[in-house]
Amino acid sequence: GLNATAFPSGVMTMPVEATEHAGPVIIWRKELRPDSGGAGKQRGGLGQFMEVGAREGHEFDIQAMFDRVDHPANGRRGGGPGAPTTIAQDDGTKMNGKGKQFVAHGRRVVMAFPGGAGYGAASARAKASVMRDLARGYISVAVAKRDYALADADIATVMDAIASGQDI
């Protein structure tokens, strides 16, 4: 699936620079969330991590309207579920997936957006696709082994390619 997109529109979010320019907000981190896409013949798209805070001297409220907090996307035809949404402050204080919430000066909100569900059995995914996912950091070695049964020799091939700057 497509990575870091919203369902059902399939569009990506506003650029970090535009968000920071519009208000006293700092986006400390915005990156793909490895292992968040459900395993499958067609792997679910990855969610993303975002860490947001206010500029020095500011506090803020967040109007949370997050989906897939309690019910991650379910896989189809043997595919695995995507990872759920999580939201918390940087000190570990959990936040609600819905509603207006205050964030004190100096605190950050850490969000992990959900991954898409997998489609079809993970065992049917082409080995070359699994190796490419591993090389790109979309999946971890643990997921490559557990969900896709990627052999140690294939994992070593990927790690060697990464170390030498080769594409898989």
Where are these regions (language model features)?
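Glycine/proline-enriched, intrinsically flexible loops and inter-domain linkers
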Residues: 1-168
